[in-house]
Amino acid sequence: MGAKDVKFGNEARIKMLRGVNVLADAVKVTLGPKGRNVVLDKSFGAPSITKDGVSVAREIELEDKFENMGAQMVKEVASKANDAAGDGTTTATLLAQSIVNEGLKAVAAGMNPMDLKRGIDKAVISAVEELKNLSVPCSDSKAITQVGTISANADEKVGALIAEAMEKVGNDGVITVEEGTGLQNELEVVKGMQFDRGYLSPYFINKPETGIVELENPYILMADKKISNVREMLPILESVAKSGKPLLIISEDLEGEALATLVVNSMRGIVKVAAVKAPGFGDRRKAMLQDISILTGGSVISEELAMDLEKSTLEDLGQAKRVVINKDTTTIIGGSGEKQAIQSRIGQIRQEIQEATSDYDKEKLNERLAKLSGGVAVLKVGAATEVEMKEKKARVEDALHATRAAVEEGVVAGGGVALVRVAGKISNLRGHNEDQNVGIRVALRAMEAPLRQIVSNSGEEPSVVTNNVKDGKGNYGYNAATDEYGDMIDFGILDPTKVTRSALQYAASVAGLMITTECMVTDLPREDKSSDVASSPAGGMGGMGGMM
């Protein structure tokens, strides 16, 4: 283990503070409707331009290791806020910077850091309660549009598109963001359950003009096994042929004699049939087959459950109003499953999402949830250049997260007004001693920082505007986009309560740890000895001279 560089007390805190300020100053210029752009250099390709706080924070690494520790701790605030609510990263960074700066001034003046932290925590707990009281539900399309517009940096088209997507697939539906091919943003909605497996043979196609397979009111056979022997399938094929309905087979694989027999039967018109592979792999495939069986009201034929395909009957098959299959996807529309069973399955998947630890697992579970809930919406972002496309896509994703947060916990007045009102309501809060009172005042002062920065970025005087907003009541605030005062809700400037709450809680948590830091330890930079060896005349072969 190499030698360490250790710094104590004020010396350590000053270094850490310098790192905090470098990162926060780079991030906070993006805040508000008149926030500025930040250009990020990339090791290859064109530089990217962004107004997204967390994108800026992720790029920053400082040369001085002590300063870098400060910067990384604030980066953690931005990441945590982003993970919790999907937005509010710039606000969280700004709140953390303000608490750390004011808090360290108090520590330098001789205050007890632990009491300062207790005061800050007390103020934040009270502020969160007040935020909940100020919050109003966000359920109608107009409010969702407004939240989306604000979070997409005043892009009304994006706000309207997100509201339309939520209306079509529901608040729980999956909405994904993809890069489009044109200049305009587009919304594509897939109703029913769709999975990425196409037909196993083009001979199943019954709509040659569009190249798809379309089955009306089909039976659906689900098998968690490979099917290669046609004898296993004969009893069920005969039963389906008598019923006069088409059949969709979803199995791990279908090959050889079994596939050939199905193709021949389909082409001769004996049984209208199509076959696709089951989606996913391993345990995920088993779970998705189970989802399809619940959605269609059938059973999965599984050898693990001692079920035999040869003995299966029409009772084991699922049903749907319509199935559409192309070369890449299968869509099941109007499954005949019981609503209660589907709701129970949805509840089970929600529970799994809460317990999942990896982002990948959560994403896959959310996809399954949406497919059972009734649809997937795809927002296709259009732009003229690749640089603009990346910037726009990041903004649309932010706006989508913000609207979801708004639906979950409601909305408060935006533009930094909610935190100013909260600070006013808890201004009489007191701690157990004077040091805790100073901690409370540090937190209250920090709650004004977002409004001050929004005003500063728009080119006005922060103190004048902040005092005017403080003199007002309720939702009265400053609209930086139009440079006028009024009701923020009427202006359509809303913030999701969850975003504001998460930003405040995470900022106070990390800032409190930084204020109570007394020692910092990092590796000493190593001297590069390889250059000394390379410059020696023997080129690293010294010591061999005596062998002559």
From Swiss-Prot:
Its EC number is 5.6.1.7. It catalyses: ATP + H2O + a folded polypeptide = ADP + phosphate + an unfolded polypeptide. InterPro entries: Chaperonin_Cpn60_CS (IPR018370), Cpn60/GroEL (IPR001844), Cpn60/GroEL/TCP-1 (IPR002423), GroEL-like_apical_dom_sf (IPR027409), GROEL-like_equatorial_sf (IPR027413), TCP-1-like_intermed_sf (IPR027410). PROSITE patterns: CHAPERONINS_CPN60. Keywords: ATP-binding, Chaperone, Cytoplasm, Isomerase, Nucleotide-binding. Residues 526-548 are annotated as: Disordered. Pfam families: Cpn60_TCP1. GO terms for molecular function: ATP binding; ATP-dependent protein folding chaperone; isomerase activity; unfolded protein binding. ATP binds at residues 30-33, 51, 87-91, 415, 479-481, 495. It is an enzyme of class 5 (isomerase). GO terms for cellular component: cytoplasm. Residues 539-548 have a biased composition (Gly residues). It is found in: Cytoplasm. One of its GO terms (biological process) is protein refolding. Together with its co-chaperonin GroES, plays an essential role in assisting protein folding. The GroEL-GroES system forms a nano-cage that allows encapsulation of the non-native substrate proteins and provides a physical environment optimized to promote and accelerate protein folding. This is Chaperonin GroEL.
